[in-house]
């Protein structure tokens, strides 16, 4: 599984435009083969700073998303007008577990919590 962490500092007066563009991109993202999920968060201390956290099955799925023409256009609009700064991190997920899905939890955690 691949995680894409996109931190963006939205330029002054551009937050509504960015959120509208992100809303327009979401249905396209959801159609990408290998897409798992996406969530968006806002910084509690810097309201202009947003984070988008996306998960994909593999790097090929990330590449399919990157290659979409509409996404390329959104990237250009963001770089040219909407973002004062951004950082993108693409990461490999080592483990994925939760309260009820415990198969990948460390053994000591499974022993202690089930």
Label every model-predicted segment.
Residues 74, 78:
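Conserved short loop/helix modules at catalytic or binding sites
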Residues 1-50, 57-67, 82-114:
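Short S/T/G/P-rich N-terminal loop/turn motif that feeds into the first structured element of a domain
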């Amino acid at each position: 599984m691949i995680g894409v962490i996109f931190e963006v500092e939205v330029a002054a007066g551009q937050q509504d435009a960015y959120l509208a563009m992100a809303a327009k991109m979401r249905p396209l993202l959801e159609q990408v083969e290998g897409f798992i999920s996406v969530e968006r968060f806002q910084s509690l201390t810097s309201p202009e700073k947003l984070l988008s956290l996306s998960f994909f099955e593999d790097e090929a799925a990330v590449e399919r998303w990157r290659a979409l023409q509409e996404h390329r256009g959104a990237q250009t609009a963001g770089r040219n007008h909407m973002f004062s700064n951004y950082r993108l991190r693409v990461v490999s997920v080592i483990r994925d577990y939760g309260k009820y899905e415990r198969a990948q939890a460390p053994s000591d955690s499974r022993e202690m919590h089930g």
